[in-house]
Amino acid sequence: DKAPDFTVLTTDLTPFQFSSTRGKVRIISSVPSLDTPVCDAQTRRFNEEAARLPGVEILTISMDLPFAQKRWCGAAGIDRVACYSDHRDASFGLAYGTLIKELRLDTRAVFVVDADDTVRYVEYVPEIADHPNYEAALETVRKLIGS
């Protein structure tokens, strides 16, 4: 399937359009809130893995306010994963089916999108407190980049 486009906010409140990353392999890591233990661990894990995935763009998306994301990323030393806020329009959550309307949060999920905007891997984590299958997502990425 073709990856839907969406617009989220950077930690500096600048709109960011997913289509601007076309031409790269991308991991989209959806988390309910960076201020929770599993979301924290998920974002740190992808930040660590990014060093071994040259040319791969990794996006973490949550409903956290951009100010909170900026503070958290700075404190956690997140420097290889870009954090984006879906709080304004829920554009990502609506496009990818991660929006939990009653809570106005995005559920935990991981997507791998290839350079041609085709979704190659999808995981919606059924229990919000569980980790995603990192290895399955990363294996998909490695195959796409030939490493």
List where the protein language model places each region.
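Chalcogenol-based redox active-site neighborhoods
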Residues: 1-147
